[in-house]
Amino acid sequence: MMGLADDGGLLVPNELPFVESNLDKWRTLSFTELSLEIMLLFTSGRIPREELMSMVKKSYASFRHPEITPVKSVGKLHVLELFHGPTFAFKDVALQFLGNLFAYFLTKRNHPLRILGATSGDTGSAVSYTHLTLPTSDLV
């Protein structure tokens, strides 16, 4: 595992899956159902569907809104609320799932995860909270 790409940039997929044919079907899905469908495109069968759904549900169980990231409309303006996570940071949306993803693969390999945190920003609190709840991680 690595934090940055060899060139110092972010890690991104070589190609993105084609999803246009799924958009109409996805329109009616809940946040967790949609998350599952999207993550299935990127996990290439490495995580069984049932386990991935369990991971998605666990990741967002601590969010304070039943829709996880509800959309609020004010006239013609639509706003996606990303602050309902455990630390109120928008980063909770990604990091809650990422922590569970790390835990899944590290548990399969029987490896612990140790995190040394040194930050005062919202990323640090979002990462810290994620790993406080994982049995395979230690946070310093």
Regions found by a protein language model. Name each.
Residues E81, G85-A103:
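Glycine-rich oxoanion-binding loops at beta->alpha junctions
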Residues T130-T136:
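Conserved small/polar residues in nucleotide/adenosyl-binding loops
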Residues D92, A118-S128:
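Short glycine/serine/threonine-rich phosphate/pyrophosphate-binding segments
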Residues R109-A118:
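A conserved hydrophobic secondary-structure block that centers on an alpha-helix together
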Residues G9-F88:
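Small-residue-rich anion-binding loops in enzyme active sites
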Residues M1-D7:
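Charged, compositionally biased N-terminal leader segments and the immediate start
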